[in-house]
Amino acid sequence: DQQRCIELLNVLADATSGQSEIFDSNIFSKLISNERGSLVIAEENKIILGMASISFNLALRYNGEYCQLEELVVDQDARGKNVGGLLIQEAINLAKKRGCKEFGLYLLESTKHNQPFYEKYGFVKIGAEMRQSL
């Protein structure tokens, strides 16, 4: 259910930036139909509890693709039930099946408290990221 996923993404935007964003359904459609990304959905009784979006990127340093976690969000009522863990595990499995050399993610200042969660699934901190808004 695209609408439910967009609702969850807006919850994530509010939690990470303090601003509620309206995600573009056209971008969502491109993500699920494009070979450069994928969505992993967790549902129970046809209710979406959470989602993870991942992108697949080419890099010379890997002589192939690597995977990037773009968003991971779990409904407030489903937290503490390992939904996030199951989403991460499935995203990692998708990346492995695709032949990705590495799986990465970024922790923002507002999400760095999640570092122990990701460490449970084998992620290690490797440095700082730099960015420029365009």
What role is predicted for each listed range?
Residues N57, D75, L108:
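Residue-level recognition of the GNAT/N-acetyltransferase active site
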